[in-house]
Structures are given as C-alpha cells and as structure tokens.
Amino acid sequence: MLKPSVTSAPTADMATLTVVQPLTLDRDVARAIELLEKLQESGEVPVHKLQSLKKVLQSEFCTAIREVYQYMHETITVNGCPEFRARATAKATVAAFAASEGHSHPRVVELPKTDEGLGFNVMGGKEQNSPIYISRIIPGGVAERHGGLKRGDQLLSVNGVSVEGEHHEKAVELLKAAKDSVKLVVRYTPKVLEEMEARFEKLRTARRRQQQQLLIQQQQQQQQQPQQNHMS
C-alpha cells in the first residue's frame, strides 16, 4: 500500500540556500587556477590544454571582465527576489562582455571628486551620432594625476549608469552629480575618436566656408548699395 508523501519543514541547511551570497570572483578564479595546477601535477590532462586555460584566467582580459562584472553587479540595487537577482546578474554579464567587444578591454577607473573638477573633457553623444569620449586630459588635473584615464577612452558608464547611446548632456549631468568620487567604466578606442574628430573638423571647415561666403556676399551687397543710390 502506498504511503502518502510527507513534506518536511525547511531545515536550517535548506534555508541557507535562499541567502544571497556576495560575489567571490577573485577567490573563485584563484581556486580554479589552484585546481588546474593540481591537475597538471597529476598528468591526467594534457599539459598544454591546462596551461592555455590557466593563461586565460590570469590574463588582463579576464581580470578586466571580472572587475567590470563585479562593479556592475554591486552598483545595481538588488532585493531578495530571485527575479531581480537574475536581472542584475544578466545585466552585469552583458555590460562586461559588451564593453569588451571590438578594440580593447574594459577598465574601471575611480577618480576623487574635488572642487577643481575631474580634470578631463568629453565630446560626442547621441545627438552627434557618436559615442561619448574622453577628448582631453587637462594637464595637472585630477585625471592626469591619477593616471587611469586616456584621451580616446570611450565612456561606457558613470557610477553604474550606462551612457552608451545617451546624449552628451546626460553624461555631463552624471559627472556633475557625483559626490566624493566617481567610478567610470571605459575602453580605449583612439581610432574611433580620431575618426569622430576628423568628421567634426570637416563639419567645422564646411561651416567656416559658408560663413566666409556669406560675409563676402554681404560685403558685395554693401559695396553695390552706394553705387545704386548714386545712380538714382
């Protein structure tokens, strides 16, 4: 005869499964490297495969991805709901790998916010159909003294808020609103900045030519006016 199943009350061990554990990416990577070294000593796996994987885990790329992932994950407000935790994890993953596409690895740069400003200028934005870039590092300013930013860095986020595809003013407002310090996620793409600056220079040159032509036309009209008055 079948006995009815009985569901036991949650135990302390089961309850711990719902506790949100902090990220331990540094420790996890270190543990993975340690296990790879033990496997290498055992000789069970070809050494060249283990060395390749170990090289990836110790690379600057992996470190950069880990830093961006952890930063994005920690700056997203997450409550106890598993759905929100999943969204935060997904958003952090997308931010890390999307930032690394193309030219260079993403970097997290933290600068102190003082009365003298942050020491750099930005250009570009959605209204100019371009990303937002660090266009100038002010000599002697905070950014130059810190040494973390480069001219040609694309600005990806400010204090956890993405500025990709945003207007120029949005990035400026976020930078101004930061207090005490500002955390930036950037990636170095100088060629794109050079192309953007070249495009802006062409627009400025075309605008100057139009202004010069307009000025010449006005001068010609002014010269013709006295002659017409004299003839009349």
UniProtKB/Swiss-Prot annotation:
CDD domains: PDZ_Lin-7-like. GO terms for biological process: exocytosis; inner ear development; neurotransmitter secretion; protein transport; regulation of synaptic assembly at neuromuscular junction; synaptic vesicle transport. Induction: Up-regulated by cell depolarization and calcium entry through L-type calcium channels. InterPro entries: L27_C, L27_dom, L27_dom_sf, LIN7, MAM_complex_regulator, PDZ, PDZ_sf. A motif (Kinase interacting site) lies at residues 14-28. It is a peripheral membrane protein. One of its GO terms (molecular function) is PDZ domain binding. Residues 25-80 form the L27 domain. Residues 108-190 form the PDZ domain. GO terms for cellular component: basolateral plasma membrane; bicellular tight junction; cell-cell junction; membrane; MPP7-DLG1-LIN7 complex; postsynaptic density membrane; presynapse; synapse. SMART domains: L27 (SM00569), PDZ (SM00228). Transmembrane segments: none annotated. It is found in: Cell membrane; Basolateral cell membrane; Cell junction; Postsynaptic density membrane. The kinase interacting site is required for proper delivery of ERBB2 to the basolateral membrane. The PDZ domain regulates endocytosis and recycling of the receptor at the membrane. Plays a role in establishing and maintaining the asymmetric distribution of channels and receptors at the plasma membrane of polarized cells. Forms membrane-associated multiprotein complexes that may regulate delivery and recycling of proteins to the correct membrane domains. The tripartite complex composed of LIN7 (LIN7A, LIN7B or LIN7C), CASK and APBA1 associates with the motor protein KIF17 to transport vesicles containing N-methyl-D-aspartate (NMDA) receptor subunit NR2B along microtubules. Forms a complex with CASK and CASKIN1. Component of the brain-specific heterotrimeric complex (LIN-10-LIN-2-LIN-7 complex) composed of at least APBA1, CASK, and LIN7, which associates with the motor protein KIF17 to transport vesicles along microtubules. Can also interact with other modular proteins containing protein-protein interaction domains like PALS1, PALS2, MPP7, DLG1, DLG2 and DLG3 through its L27 domain. Interacts with DLG4 and GRIN2B as well as CDH1 and CTNNB1, the channels KCNJ12/Kir2.2, KCNJ4/Kir2.3 and probably KCNJ2/Kir2.1 and SLC6A12/BGT-1 via its PDZ domain. This is Protein lin-7 homolog A. The gene is Lin7a.
